[in-house]
């Protein structure tokens, strides 16, 4: 969805809008900035208390940012050079080296606080980054307003991950100036206006678990039932998370369900995470029990005393053996989630992308009463710039009038989207086509499954409904999918 000047004007001139904008413009002390962090991201309290936040903000202002008070930045290039200099030269407080020169690993967790001070002095070029452990919310905002985010650097490149904040600054500078927002208005837009537009994720259609993963750590905060947790980047929404609580508990104590696909967060030290929910308490399985168990005594994770547990993949055999132990403790394992193994419909073979189209997708569309050149077309040529054309795989419910091509449903077929990176790349490709065709639904499919993304005011890479090909034997699921595509 494009930025709507009319809706923004209504917000900007409302009492709520004026208050939010003023909160970012009237920052006279660090406690005021601390309150902004706490208001717009309460999870910050999981890692930092108020005194710590104010102390870090004060240190960055007094010993890094304020020395540039007389500087007038004339361009993005100058601002980028200043930022790189600041993050590369460490932090000395009087005679104490608080942050070593070139310690980009440590700098990662401090970027949000530095960003607040840079925004205070050079608001034209820097925005306050408050998405601590909430990077998925930033991607949702970007998807909703059709903003293309920069490619996230590799996990091991800590400097590039620190510089990613500057890459975001450049993207949002273009968005802000293009839509006529002041720096303080943009901050209010990002943290107060936009979140009210983004629909809350509906997890009633949770996909079947495709995998299981081990995670670990003590469950604090009164035994919470949902939250942010380090995980494997290949975690998928609906997957099973087997929780090993570390010392002094030293036992597997519960299962969780991943609420979102694995999120790569460049500013999170461990890089990948998910949100956990739907907690299921199980009889405790102690480390001592596992070490004496015939199967788990030789398991590499058990032999390592669960060192490096977060994101460790659990095989189907691992999970089955856990079920055996839990059942032996008198627990009804039929109540526990099971890993789902997809299979192709009987008699179907798929060896490449074209097989997905011919043997799976087209028969499904035909069964729903939609046929090529009547209801859908393959490789619809779309004008995308002067002398350039692109060809989406399938356009369903289409209008191929030259220069005005449209399709209500955009379908991209792949052979195998084997990981989250492949799925995201396919989504972004389809998203770019959908914007040109004014599509309301995006469908991604491969040899295993069908992913349906509905616009609902704005697409989101994290909001989809998942079907397996064999689900189409179920009349309820078949008709549900048909209804989603019958727009």
Annotate each PLM feature:
Residues 235-237, 246-247, 338-441, 449-487:
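A short, conserved, highly charged catalytic patch centered on acidic carboxylates
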Residues 266-313, 435-437, 443-487:
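Mixed-charge intrinsically disordered linker/loop segments at interdomain junctions
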Residues 1-108, 123-206:
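An N-terminal alpha-helical hairpin/helix-loop-helix interaction module that forms a charged
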Residues 110-113:
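Small-residue hinge/turn detector
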Residues 251-262:
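Short beta-strand-centered aromatic/proline hotspots
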Residues 170-204, 220, 227, 265-343:
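Contiguous surface segments at macromolecular interaction interfaces
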Residues 1-38, 306, 316-374, 378:
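Charged, often low-complexity linker/regulatory segments
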């Amino acid at each position: 969805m494009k930025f709507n000047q009319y809706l923004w004007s209504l917000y900007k001139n409302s009492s709520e809008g004026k208050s939010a904008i003023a909160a970012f413009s009237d920052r006279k002390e660090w406690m005021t900035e601390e309150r902004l962090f706490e208001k717009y991201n309460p999870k910050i309290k999981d890692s930092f208390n108020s005194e710590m936040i104010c102390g870090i903000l004060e240190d960055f202002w007094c010993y890094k940012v304020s020395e540039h008070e007389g500087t007038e930045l004339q361009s993005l290039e100058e601002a980028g050079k200043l930022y790189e200099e600041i993050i590369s030269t460490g932090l000395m407080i009087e005679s104490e080296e608080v942050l070593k020169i070139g310690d980009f690993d440590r700098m990662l967790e401090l970027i949000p606080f530095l960003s607040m001070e840079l925004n205070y002095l050079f608001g034209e070029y820097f925005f306050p980054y408050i998405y601590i452990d909430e990077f998925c919310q930033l991607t949702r905002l970007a998807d909703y307003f059709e903003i293309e985010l920069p490619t996230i650097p590799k996990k091991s490149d800590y400097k590039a991950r620190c510089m990613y904040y500057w890459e975001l600054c450049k993207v949002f500078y273009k968005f802000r100036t293009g839509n006529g927002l002041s720096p303080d208005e943009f901050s209010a837009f990002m943290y107060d206006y936009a979140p009210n537009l983004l629909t809350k994720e509906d997890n009633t259609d949770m996909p079947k678990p495709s995998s299981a993963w081990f995670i670990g750590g003590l469950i604090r905060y009164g035994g919470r039932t949902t939250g942010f947790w380090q995980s494997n980047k290949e975690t998928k929404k609906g997957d099973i998370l087997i929780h090993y609580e570390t010392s002094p508990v030293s036992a597997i104590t519960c299962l969780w369900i991943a609420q979102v696909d694995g999120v790569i967060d460049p500013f999170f030290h461990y890089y990948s995470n998910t949100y956990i929910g739907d907690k299921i308490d199980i009889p405790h399985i102690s480390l001592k029990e596992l070490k004496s168990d015939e199967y788990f005594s030789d398991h590499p994770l058990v032999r390592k005393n669960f060192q490096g547990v977060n994101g460790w993949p659990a095989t189907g055999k691992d999970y089955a053996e856990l079920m055996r132990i839990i059942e032996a403790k008198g627990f009804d394992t039929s109540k526990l989630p099971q890993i789902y193994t997809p299979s192709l419909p009987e008699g179907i073979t798929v060896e490449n992308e074209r097989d997905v189209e011919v043997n799976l997708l087209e028969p499904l569309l035909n069964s729903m009463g939609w046929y090529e050149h009547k209801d859908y077309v393959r490789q619809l040529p779309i004008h995308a710039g002067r002398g350039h054309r692109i060809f989406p795989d399938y356009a369903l419910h289409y209008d191929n009038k030259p220069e005005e091509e449209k399709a209500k449903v955009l379908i991209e077929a792949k052979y195998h989207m084997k990981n989250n990176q492949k799925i995201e790349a396919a989504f972004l490709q389809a998203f770019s086509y959908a914007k040109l065709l004014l599509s309301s639904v995006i469908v991604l499919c491969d040899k295993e499954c069908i992913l349906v993304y509905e616009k609902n005011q704005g697409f989101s890479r994290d909001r989809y409904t998942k079907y397996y090909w064999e689900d189409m034997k179920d009349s309820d699921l078949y008709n549900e999918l048909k209804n989603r595509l019958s727009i």
